[in-house]
Amino acid sequence: MPREQKQVRELQEGSYVMMDSSPCKINHYSTAKPGKHGSAKARVEGKGVFDEKKRSLSQPVDAKVWVPIIQRKQGQVVSVSGDDAQVMDLDTYETFTMRIPEGEDFTSDDNIEYLEYEGQRKVVG
């Protein structure tokens, strides 16, 4: 699994973190000051990269969490069939099928950018 461990205090809005075994993009990050009996706490709110579900995480700032290493890749649309597109990776020349997001209109020979993590892929931009 391409991921690494970081302390919660090292996270920032816009970066990625694993929540409930799913990679999520951090939308909001806040900390509460340490009290008389305990350390500072951080609250992280994020949205699933591939499933769009909202998730939250509350941990001490010195706790360790997993951070996924999500790759941003380039591809070319080979063919379009309904809601699916046949895409060829421009680095490895591997072809695979991807779901076309609503509102997007792809044609053959379009270059696209997509995110990939553990076999899951999503078109961005």
Swiss-Prot record:
Q: Does the keyword ATP-binding apply?
A: no
Q: Name one Pfam family in it.
A: IF5A-like_N
Concerning InterPro entries, the annotation shows: IF5A-like, IF5A-like_N, NA-bd_OB-fold, Rib_uL2_dom2, Trans_elong_IF5A_hypusine_site, Transl_elong_IF5A_arc, Transl_elong_IF5A_C, Translation_prot_SH3-like_sf
Q: Where in or outside the cell?
A: Cytoplasm
Q: Which UniProt keywords apply?
A: Cytoplasm, Hypusine, Initiation factor, Protein biosynthesis
Instruction: Name the HAMAP family for this protein.
Output: eIF_5A (MF_00085)
Q: What does this protein do?
A: Functions by promoting the formation of the first peptide bond.
- The name on file for this protein is Translation initiation factor 5A
**Natural source organism:** Halorubrum lacusprofundi (strain ATCC 49239 / DSM 5036 / JCM 8891 / ACAM 34)
Gene name of this polypeptide = eIF5A
